């Protein structure tokens, strides 16, 4: 199935009942062009093409299953981290931002060549992995997503944690050590809550993560493709994120006994500081579906 809108931003996804149903909703309610035959026989079943970024099936399970199946392909991640550049037409960011966005993507392609030619490749990631230095990719992703963190509230630390997790899913890490001792697939899946997928790249972060313990019951997707220019973040907002980051570092250095085990307590964020949650206590504030 192919979903085509104005623009040339391409995502590859498997043919599943959930994705097919979502495609029909887009076609019926939003007027997108849906074709079921254009890519028959292709290496991947169908593409989602949308100049505004990422569209996925409604609900958490569809996104997580997509990540689970597709993250072994480097082309998927390349599209995601290149999204800031390939979506830089006047209908999305405005022409004044195009040069900056394009330049950043070009620098990535030059530095990490030969990856620049595999954005539309259906070859598996294993064929390209040996040519890429893990540290180079980490530095690029961290640098770009740090620009977004102030628009998500206190999310700077969790941005790094989730990027590491996604790279672990691709095989960059043999296990989750160094990522956060509880930040594994089930934990990730069970505690995410999806807000707005339209006009956003498909990266999700929590408001704050303390070594895998989720500090607040609010999870957001990266907003901004249609709402603001992430290349020029607000300085005061970044200062707030850095302040919370220091709190997270302090908390990690002060391990406490919880339920008789030597592990860190869970924390919630009250809008100002992180506060510990006692054994058996619940998160203060609204608890959204998906929390367990």
Curated annotation (Swiss-Prot):
Function field: May be involved in transmission by vector nematode species.
Stated name of the protein: 32 kDa protein
Lineage: Viruses, Riboviria, Orthornavirae, Kitrinoviricota, Alsuviricetes
